[in-house]
Amino acid sequence: MADLAKIVDDLSALTVLEAAELSKLLEEKWGVSAAAPVAVAAAGGAAPAAAAEEKTEFDVVLADGGANKINVIKEVRAITGLGLKEAKDLVEGAPKAVKEGASKDEAEKIKAQLEAAGAKVELK
C-alpha cells in the first residue's frame, strides 16, 4: 500500500502539462485511447417523440440579414468571435448557422440579439 500512496502523491504533484504528457505516454504504451466510448441506445416506440419534446440543443440559423446588415454583422461578430469578412460572408450567405449545439437559454438569447439588430432568425 505504501507504493500506491507514493504513486498518488507523485501524480498529485504533476502539472497539467505533465499530466497530459503522462496520458499520451500511457496511451501509446497500452495501445488505448482516452476518448470516451459512445453508447448506442436502442430506441423504443415512444422515445423519438419524447426526444423531440425534450430537445436540449439548438442550432441558431440566420434566415435573413434584414435591411440593416451592418448591425447584424456587428452582432454576429460579437456572438461568434468571427472576423469582419467572415461575419459579413455569413450574413450575406444566409440562411446559415450562427451557432450550433447551443442550450435553449443561449439560443433564445442569441436569437433575441440578432432580431434586435434586424435579422430574421430560426431555431432548429
Swiss-Prot record:
InterPro entries: Ribosomal_bL12, Ribosomal_bL12_C, Ribosomal_bL12_C/ClpS-like, Ribosomal_bL12_oligo, Ribosomal_bL12_oligo_N_sf
Annotated Gene Ontology cellular component terms: cytosolic large ribosomal subunit
SUPFAM superfamilies: ClpS-like (SSF54736), Ribosomal protein L7/12, oligomerisation (N-terminal) domain (SSF48300)
Domain of life: Bacteria
One Pfam family cited in the UniProt record for this chain: Ribosomal_L12_N
UniProtKB keywords: Ribonucleoprotein, Ribosomal protein
Disulfide bonds: none
Signal sequence, renumbered to the chain: none
Keyword Ribosomal protein: yes
GO biological process, one term: translation
Single Gene Ontology MF annotation: structural constituent of ribosome
Family of the protein in this entry: Belongs to the bacterial ribosomal protein bL12 family.
Job of this protein: Forms part of the ribosomal stalk which helps the ribosome interact with GTP-bound translation factors. Is thus essential for accurate translation.
Quaternary structure and interacting proteins, as annotated: Homodimer. Part of the ribosomal stalk of the 50S ribosomal subunit. Forms a multimeric L10(L12)X complex, where L10 forms an elongated spine to which 2 to 4 L12 dimers bind in a sequential fashion. Binds GTP-bound translation factors.
Name the UniProt record assigns to this protein: Large ribosomal subunit protein bL12
Protein's organism: Brucella anthropi (strain ATCC 49188 / DSM 6882 / CCUG 24695 / JCM 21032 / LMG 3331 / NBRC 15819 / NCTC 12168 / Alc 37)
